[in-house]
Amino acid sequence: MAASAALFSRLRSGLRVGARGLCTRLAPPPPRTPEQVTEIANRGGSKAQGPQHQPGSEGPSYAKKIALWIAGLLGAGGTVSIVYIFGNNPVDENGTKIPDEFDSDPILVQQLRRTYKYFKDYRQMIIEPTSPCLLPDPLREPYYQPPYTLVLELTGVLLHPEWSLATGWRFKKRPGIETLFQQLAPLYEIVIFTSETGMTAFPLIDSVDPHGFISYRLFRDATRYMEGHHVKDISCLNRDPARVVVVDCKKEAFRLQPFNGVALRPWDGNSDDRVLLDLSAFLKTIALNQVEDVRTVLEHYALEDDPLEAFKQRQSRLEQEEQQRLAELSKSNRQGLSFGSLASRLWPRSKQP
């Protein structure tokens, strides 16, 4: 009993101590100063505005890294493949390697320099004409060489592309093509110089010229590529520039020699069009007047929106002036004739013995 009473008294004293400690812990904190309250509020605001972790935000970042790695590997593999393919020596028909100026370099340097040369030559092929002399030398006697050269664009000048769901792409012939060729072939060496590719333009030229009036054909690879335009450089034609006329629907096509060109409006497919007939009359007038330098004539029409219409108006005005001059001359002749008749009546000639 004594032991039980002692144990019970110890438990009661322990509970009292525990209750006293609990009351101490649950007691209210001491009052804070206004500065402490402001500091605590600022800390809480900065934590609330700080970066918050969003679930799943690591997923897109990981995917981007994987995509960049794959793109880098593909780019590196493509670069190595290009250098390997275009960096080897060219081979002949028997499969034997053809030596070049890069054989003395280390292998990697050889590959890189050959690849660079290949793409440089390819770019040069696109920008520059295929040859500094696009046409052969003029014909000599006993063969006939027309005194002038006429350079014609195909699309927009002679043909108009049309597309329909039933037929697809078709090219419509401009009215007056046959007349143009027949009247100008004896006076002009006719050359088709088009910005179209040879694969597209060759059969079209065959269709518009079944009688063979066209002397030569030049395609896109013969143009000079400048600022997004295919320019026709007359200096590469191997002909006297003073006797070359370029007909195109884009002034940029003859920008290097602006006074050698006649810019027409692009044909829209109208079947009542008569521009080629007017062009034939204009060029025929130049040739029949034996103009030494066509640039002196074409310079007057270079600033006109419609050179052929300006030529027709000037021609009509000259015809009216000529008719007026002839009328005045005829009137003066009639007056002179009537005066002579009156004088002969007043003073008859003496009869011969």
Curated annotation (Swiss-Prot):
GO terms for cellular component: endoplasmic reticulum; Golgi apparatus; mitochondrial inner membrane; mitochondrion; nuclear speck; TIM23 mitochondrial import inner membrane translocase complex. It holds the Pfam family NIF. The keyword Phosphoprotein applies. Residues 24-59 are annotated as: Disordered. Residues 143-286 form the FCP1 homology domain. It is found in: Mitochondrion inner membrane. Belongs to the TIM50 family. Essential component of the TIM23 complex, a complex that mediates the translocation of transit peptide-containing proteins across the mitochondrial inner membrane. Has some phosphatase activity in vitro; however such activity may not be relevant in vivo. This is Mitochondrial import inner membrane translocase subunit TIM50. The gene is Timm50.
